[in-house]
């Protein structure tokens, strides 16, 4: 598994490959400097930790996302890009004529449509950032993510629209979830002096407070996402080390 420091983003339009450390830890304090360095793998909060540490005040979900793990993707496609992985998951949630547009998970004994991963890679103009141990790790320009995926879906007979913008507000995600629509959240953070980004498919939102004994006891906004590596997680939407955020909303 590659280090999250192997490749850094060159500008605000690139989403690089990053991967977490093997161990998950409690997120750093919200009082951290806005430009503190952090490992991207430390940012997602595992579901088990979240529900044992936070009290949910309000929430809404579109349901669980079908997903393939990074290990599965690398083994079967010899590629990995976080934006493509997020879109692959979204494609598995779209239905055409009563059937999923693609199979995006191996859960329940299913066989993912790995060729579709490559097709989404091509449609979004994802480029190879580097090759390690025979695996191509890719980067996707944020502005190509939505239009490329719309083109991919339209070519398969599914009518999809998209919109995208930098610095989205949390209320926009709440409206998307209320409309049962898909979103991709992209964020950048400083990691050992380099700007490293990551894209994740969104499945819900949560307003939560830390449980007694876990300060601060104020409500915060979280997104429920497929972390792009191993499973569903929560992301603090106002995480102090994010230097840039970007959203792609889909409808249809």
Give, region by region, the residue ranges found by the protein language model:
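Predominantly the structural core of cysteine protease catalytic domains
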Residues: 88-89, 122-208
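Active-site signature of cysteine proteases
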Residues: 2-7, 169-171, 178-179, 186-252
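Generic detector of intrinsically disordered, low-complexity, polar/charged segments
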Residues: 5, 38, 60, 95, ...
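Ser/Thr- (and often Asn-) enriched beta-sheet segments in non-cytosolic proteins
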Residues: 27, 44, 159-161, 224
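Active-site-adjacent structural segments surrounding the nucleophilic cysteine of cysteine proteases
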Residues: 1-138
């Amino acid at each position: 598994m590659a280090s999250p420091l192997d490749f850094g983003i060159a500008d605000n339009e690139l989403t690089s490959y990053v991967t977490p450390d093997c161990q998950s830890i409690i997120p750093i304090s919200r009082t951290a400097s806005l430009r503190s360095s952090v490992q991207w793998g430390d940012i997602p909060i595992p579901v088990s930790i979240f529900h044992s540490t936070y009290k949910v005040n309000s929430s809404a979900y579109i349901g669980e996302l079908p997903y393939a793990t990074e290990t599965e993707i690398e083994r079967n496609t010899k590629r990995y890009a976080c934006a493509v992985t997020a879109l692959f998951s979204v494609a598995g949630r779209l239905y055409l004529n009563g059937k999923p547009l693609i199979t995006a998970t191996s859960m329940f004994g299913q066989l993912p449509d790995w060729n579709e991963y490559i097709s989404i890679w091509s449609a979004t103009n994802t480029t190879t950032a580097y090759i390690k141990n025979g695996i191509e790790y890719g980067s996707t320009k944020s502005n190509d993510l939505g239009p490329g995926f719309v083109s991919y879906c339209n070519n398969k007979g599914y009518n999809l629209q998209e919109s995208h913008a930098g610095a989205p507000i949390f209320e926009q995600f709440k409206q998307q979830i209320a409309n049962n629509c898909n979103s991709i959240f992209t964020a950048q953070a400083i990691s050992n002096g380099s700007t490293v980004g990551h894209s994740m498919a969104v499945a819900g939102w949560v307003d939560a407070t830390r449980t007694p004994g876990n300060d601060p006891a104020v409500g915060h906004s979280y997104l429920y996402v497929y972390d792009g590596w191993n499973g569903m997680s929560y992301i603090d939407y106002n995480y102090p080390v994010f230097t840039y955020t970007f959203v792609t909303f889909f409808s249809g």
